A protein has these predicted regions:
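Carbohydrate transferase catalytic cores enriched for Leloir-type hexosyltransferases
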Residues: 1-299
Length: 299
């Protein structure tokens, strides 16, 4: 039997980087600085690239990928090695899991009105099943804010004594060099004269508010970064013909840092978050103003 005590679900390394994946990466980097060799392993599907660690060993295991790997191969590894699991991305194996799980938020349970189309309802059903399973099976739950901790207790009856808060961080922004070339590529953006928002089509991100704000301030430039069909969504909302809105598409971390540093204000009109990393990152980058919604998670 292996001497490994904890085996981390490393399947997130194969996913596109977002707040949850960023949290997981930074958490493991911090763990690597304090754990003894052999105490923690990261288990990944085959062919997944990971950072280099000093004290944490990375193990490629199994034959599947994605959700199937999480549900079949990962718990098989835990059983074979007698290790506790550490799952950092809201999902655990439905069977065969013993250990610690990170729940970033319970948005699917708290705001079902955000998930009304067939795909959204299916996703909500899966995540709510996961929330219930984590509440029942995890030995401890980590979450990212006192607000999220209170929501887990409210909806799933998890006692506070079973939960710990490990906050999101901003320090990763210090390691990113700002990419000032974004301004040469978009000469409409003058430092200190534009509002900046990092958007997506998730309803909690409240993208329509940004467009309405742009419509109310026709003399101001609104720079919107983010992948997906943001322009198509603006057209669906009847807000596509706003000449002061500039869609930047997906931007690199370096470009985002430069845009945050030189904006007039960073906009984060969220309707629900477990933590909400972007305002903290914007503050770390020197954004002179940060405008957030008046919702409990932002207070």
């Amino acid at each position: 039997m292996s001497e490994t005590v904890w085996a981390v679900d490393g399947s997130f390394f194969a996913q596109r980087l977002s707040g949850i994946q960023r949290y997981s990466i930074e958490l493991l980097a911090a763990l690597d600085r304090i754990v003894p060799p052999g105490f923690v392993e990261i288990v990944t599907p085959p062919g997944v690239e990971t950072p280099h660690y000093t004290n944490i060993k990375v193990v490629s295991f199994g034959t599947h990928r994605g959700g199937v790997w999480q549900q079949l191969d990962y718990p098989r590894y835990l059983r074979q090695h007698g290790a506790g699991g550490l799952a950092t991305c809201n999902v655990i194996p439905l069977f065969g899991f013993r250990g610690i799980a990170v729940v970033h938020d319970v948005c699917y349970r708290a705001r079902p009105d955000f998930y009304t189309d067939p795909r959204g309802r299916l996703s909500a059903a899966w995540h709510c099943l996961q929330y219930r399973r984590i509440a029942k099976r995890a030995e401890r739950i980590i979450t990212v804010s006192e607000f999220s901790k209170s929501e887990i207790a409210k909806y799933y009856g998890v006692p506070a004594s079973k939960m710990d808060v490990v906050y999101n961080a901003w320090q990763q922004m210090q390691r990113i060099a700002p990419d000032e070339s974004i301004f040469a590529r978009h000469p409409q953006l003058k430092p200190g004269q534009y509002y900046f928002n990092m958007a997506n089509l998730l309803k909690n991100k409240n993208f329509p508010w940004v467009l309405r704000a742009a419509g109310a301030k026709p003399d101001a430039v609104f720079a919107i970064a983010g992948g997906g069909s943001l322009a198509a969504e603006a057209e669906r909302l009847g807000l596509a013909d706003l000449p002061n809105v500039l869609y930047l598409g997906y931007v690199s971390d370096g470009a985002a840092k430069a845009l945050m540093a030189h904006c007039k204000a960073f906009l984060f009109p969220t309707l629900y978050e477990g933590f909400g990393i972007p305002p903290l990152e914007a503050a770390a980058c020197g954004a002179p103003q940060i405008i957030v919604s008046d919702t409990p998670c932002m207070r």
